[in-house]
Amino acid sequence: MLYEKFEYNINNLIGNFGLSKMSIAVSGGSDSVALLYLANIWAEKNNIELFVISVDHNLREQSKQETHYIQNISNSLNRKHYSLSFDHQNNFSNLQERAREGRYDLMTNLCLELDILVLLTAHHEDDYVENFCLRLERNSGIFGLSSSNINWYNNIHIIRPLYNIPKSELVEYLVSHNIKWFEDESNSSDKYRRNVIRQKLAKGADYIRHFSKPVYREEFKGDTERSTAAYTSVGEEALLRGPVKLTVSSRGLTTVKTIKSTNNFSIFNWIPWSSHGMTEVKLIHATMPREDASTGTASKLSLEAKCGKMSKAAIISQQLKTNKRIENEFKPELISAIAEAVKIFEYGFAFLDLVKFDKFSNEVKVQIINFLLIIISGQSRAARFYSVEPILKLITQDVNFKNTLHGCIIKRIQNELLIYREFGKKLPESKILLDKSVIWDNRFCITKNQETPNCFVTHLSLKDYKIIKKQLDLEPLKNLSCKNHNAVLLTLPIIKILEKVIAIPHISYYDNDMWNFEVSFSPNFVSRFTHFC
């Protein structure tokens, strides 16, 4: 029975989360409508309040009909419905990616407003198969080819309980219960490669891979074959048997110890730094059987995949093997690499220990660089491999350098890599402090502890810096950043009233004793492998 399979999935994915409410993304298509009815049954059984969210992308005439239909279903199920609207601003370049990002921004921001931690989405087995094929054609490494049923976006837990259920079962469920849904006409267009793959697999035909030029060059190959190393800093036993806790101060990572697991999923949970004192980082990973962890066989694509012809069953099998190797080998290595080689500071910059970094596999090296670029830049998408590859090559040359990438300055200083924010031509938007707290530049959370009229958060301009520089104590920042304090200072949030700088909380600068602000480094991080919030 479909519901029993769904119930088993969602119970395993959520675990003992202690939820009283959750949200669900519903578009009007067969997948999400089926998910809505299944989730409604489960929510009733578990006494959970379910909030239904629809996003109108304003691209199709029938989209408003779909939203109205979902609202009617929600009302009939006695569930609250929220209709959101994506503004494409008549910009149709890279529209699919922008629409997806905009959709998740809208939905997760609403979840934060409603104090909801979990968002259900209707990604099903066929979606995972299509994604695998598309990533294979893009020459993705093993991390790119893997899939996850649990993701994080904007610190919201994205759960996909239909991951092992084919679309045909969802359609059959709707038909048998006389439930209507909408078909998106664009899904039948040959314009998109995904649709071509979908149509072939739906007819039971084999997937024929489109080969593109190799992304991995001879100088730097991903998915290297190697035996599993002992992770000395954290300890292999700790990584394989359970999660670890990292204690953090303003000087970076200091201690590591094993803690008890809370769920069956992997997260890198960063409780943001306060501008005063110390806090913790919880580094958690799911434990899985160690069989095959040291053989490396799971990472090898099947002969069918290499030849470019696979059945749907073969694709699913290859996906499972890939996922297993990620869980057994690469994810523990990634966790170990972050614990050993990375230091992230409350000022929004990071150092990477290149001596320790060098011992990890190339696939993990790419993930670490992207991990840092996303955190420091505040962006929600990772850099492409072809952009990261030159940095990795420079690192191997053992010479100091300074480059820009993905909204960051990357600077080698002897055996360390310093990464800090670069504004470039696109300066961060100023934010008015109307509420008690505000997120600025997708990185910092600023909280006011008193009523402050007409103040706003922005960055420090050179003009303002010249006016107040003699009043600033930059010695701590200077020491921590290896004398890059001036560059880092210009990336920090400041509070102004009209044209006057009244506070720079990071360096404890206040022009008046009455002001009191707190700041924490809390970027909107997106990952299938690690997370912090």
Curated annotation (Swiss-Prot):
Signal peptide: none
Disulfide partners: none
Main location: cytoplasm
GO CC terms: cytoplasm
Entry keyword Cell membrane: no
Family matches, as InterPro entries: Rossmann-like_a/b/a_fold, RPE1, TilS/TtcA_N, tRNA_Ile_lys_synt, tRNA_Ile_lys_synt_N
GO biological process: tRNA modification
Coiled coil: none
Gene3D superfamilies: HUPs
Enzyme class: ligase
Pfam families recorded: ATP_bind_3
Keywords: ATP-binding, Cytoplasm, Ligase, Nucleotide-binding, tRNA processing
EC number, UniProt record: 6.3.4.19
Molecular-function GO terms, alphabetical: ATP binding; tRNA(Ile)-lysidine synthase activity
Chain residues that bind ATP: 27-32
Subcellular location: Cytoplasm
Catalyzed reactions: cytidine(34) in tRNA(Ile2) + L-lysine + ATP = lysidine(34) in tRNA(Ile2) + AMP + diphosphate + H(+)
Keyword set includes Transcription: no
PANTHER family per record: TRNA(ILE)-LYSIDINE SYNTHASE-RELATED
UniProt-listed NCBIfam families: lysidine_TilS_N (TIGR02432), RPE1 (TIGR01045)
Protein family membership: Belongs to the tRNA(Ile)-lysidine synthase family.
Entry comment, domain topic: The N-terminal region contains the highly conserved SGGXDS motif, predicted to be a P-loop motif involved in ATP binding.
Function: Ligates lysine onto the cytidine present at position 34 of the AUA codon-specific tRNA(Ile) that contains the anticodon CAU, in an ATP-dependent manner. Cytidine is converted to lysidine, thus changing the amino acid specificity of the tRNA from methionine to isoleucine.
Designated name of the protein: tRNA(Ile)-lysidine synthase
